[in-house]
């Protein structure tokens, strides 16, 4: 069973009778002492048996979950996020425990998670790339997501756009997406614009964004995103699909080239990537790579795809990385 720092604090405030057991190694206890709660110290093989509930605490809340399962402990809770999340909650009154599986990563940590919570990502298109990208970013804790698309859900979308179901056919994509994303993360701000991106609304749409995700299948719109990205100085994360192949690159960042620099002339062979057809799994992969690169940009993780083009071959599961 799991308990969050906020829930544990409520137990304390309500005067509930329970025992907190710190099973961390001695060096962790000394370096990161628990604050704001009385506790006993034990090892994972000498946990005291009590009549009331017990709350086990390790550094990140992972070890204690395993201990409870392995020892079949009853009336025992694992503190989600462990001592790290508890001490952060005590000092900042901000419960970050729901993201404990990513804050345990040293490249993310609590500071990286705070950057995500205070960030804004603009996503152009709620199709095969936009759906998985926005789902992952909402779950990861991005504070504000701005989505734009004037399209409605069609039956042919459902195999590659996992935000939508049969009951959503005929409804505006951004309205359905907003409703479902707010259920995924109730504290995220989802701003939905029920229009296609154009030269009149573009700059206003990306205003205050840290990153722009190009999740379109339309060359003209992609060129417009590139222009807006250059004008505003906001990096553009390009994603493209062709049959079993997918592309991702971070453009217009740190003086690196943009889409129009790479493709100064319109591409031949059709205006929409969708003309070639696609299996639903591939946009899921590419859209999630776009989301991953967004997180890396916001948090400041390297290496990333700034000035690089990643080519993924889904047929052979091979990749190429080209310097731009």
Where are these regions (language model features)?
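Adenine nucleotide-associated cytosolic modules
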Residues: 1-4, 10-13, 17-19, 23-53, ...
């Amino acid at each position: 069973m799991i308990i969050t720092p906020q829930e544990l604090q409520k137990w304390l405030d309500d005067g509930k009778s329970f025992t907190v057991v710190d099973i961390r190694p001695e060096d962790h206890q000394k370096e990161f002492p628990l604050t704001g709660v009385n506790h006993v110290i034990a090892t994972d093989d000498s946990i005291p048996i009590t009549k009331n509930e017990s709350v086990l605490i390790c550094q990140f809340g992972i070890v204690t979950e395993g201990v409870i399962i392995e020892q079949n402990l009853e009336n025992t809770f694992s503190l989600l996020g462990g001592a790290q999340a508890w001490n952060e909650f005590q000092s900042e009154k901000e419960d970050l425990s729901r993201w404990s599986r990513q804050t345990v990563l040293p490249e993310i940590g609590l500071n990286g998670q705070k950057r995500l919570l205070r960030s804004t990502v603009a996503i152009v298109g709620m199709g095969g790339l936009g759906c998985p990208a926005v789902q992952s970013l909402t779950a990861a804790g991005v504070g504000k997501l701005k989505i734009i698309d004037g399209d409605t859900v069609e039956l042919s979308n459902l195999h590659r756009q996992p935000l939508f179901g049969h009951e959503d056919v005929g409804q505006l994509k951004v309205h359905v997406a907003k409703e479902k994303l707010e259920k995924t993360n109730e504290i995220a701000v989802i701003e939905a614009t029920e229009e296609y991106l154009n030269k009149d609304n573009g700059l206003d749409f990306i205003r205050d964004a840290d990153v722009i995700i190009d999740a379109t299948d339309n060359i003209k719109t992609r060129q417009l995103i590139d222009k807006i990205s250059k004008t505003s100085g906001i990096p553009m994360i390009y994603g493209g699909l062709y049959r079993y192949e997918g592309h991702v690159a971070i453009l217009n960042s740190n003086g690196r080239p943009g889409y129009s620099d790479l493709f100064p002339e319109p591409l031949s062979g059709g205006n929409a990537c969708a003309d070639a057809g696609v299996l639903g799994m591939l946009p899921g992969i590419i859209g999630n790579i776009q989301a991953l690169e967004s997180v890396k940009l916001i948090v400041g993780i390297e290496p990333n795809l700034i000035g690089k083009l990643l080519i993924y071959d889904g047929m052979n599961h091979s990749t190429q990385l080209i310097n731009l």
